[in-house]
Amino acid sequence: MKFFIDTANLEDIKKAYKLGVLAGVTTNPSLVAKEGIKFEDRIAEICQAVPKVESVSAEVTPDAVTAEEMIAQAEELIKINGGDEKVTIKLPMTLAGLEACRYLTEKGVKTNVTLIFTVNQALLAARAGATYVSPFLGRLDDISEDGVLLVAKIAELFDVHQLDTQIIAASVRHPDHVTRVAMAGAHIATIPYKVIEQLAMHPLTDQGIEKFAADWAKAPKL
């Protein structure tokens, strides 16, 4: 399973990229709004900061409700950073979003259909040609449904029908989510930087480092 970072914060993206584990970036209008910068400018900055990733998701804005409006926005977004091929158009899981997805796919544009909460939604998006689908774990957990089980069902369905669409586990809130979606068959987990930090940490690791340091301090030196 690959890792994307879910943020529009440039410093967090740069820190994650330096670790050598990052395969992509996902953003949304809410994340960009927190940064207080023009959307297109931030996407361009992200593309420049992570030259070797496979995807930078740029979502159409909420005021684009028809397929035509989404496509018009997408055609501007794919020009970012000189037509950077990493730019992936993120579309909502609506009928208009599916129509836009099919059109963009036929034009060779990568797409990420987001706000997936059912297997049927994922299947529709895959059949519309989506490069990625993004089921939301945490939001399902919030209403006492099993987000990880949804990922597992989508993965099984895609395998049975030999669909190439990749599953991005989104709304990932803690390390256990990451472990479970990896075992459930997600191709990618998109996670905030704080979860990346949590994945790398364990108290026994810290204790081991401290023990090695203490022992080394006592060792004879030449």
From Swiss-Prot:
One of its GO terms (molecular function) is aldehyde-lyase activity. Keywords: Cytoplasm, Pentose shunt, Schiff base, Transferase. It catalyses: D-sedoheptulose 7-phosphate + D-glyceraldehyde 3-phosphate = D-erythrose 4-phosphate + beta-D-fructose 6-phosphate. GO terms for biological process: carbohydrate metabolic process; pentose-phosphate shunt. GO terms for cellular component: cytoplasm. Pathway: Carbohydrate degradation; pentose phosphate pathway; D-glyceraldehyde 3-phosphate and beta-D-fructose 6-phosphate from D-ribose 5-phosphate and D-xylulose 5-phosphate (non-oxidative stage): step 2/3. The active site is at K90 (schiff-base intermediate with substrate). Its EC number is 2.2.1.2. It is found in: Cytoplasm. Transaldolase is important for the balance of metabolites in the pentose-phosphate pathway. Belongs to the transaldolase family. Type 3B subfamily. This is Probable transaldolase 2.
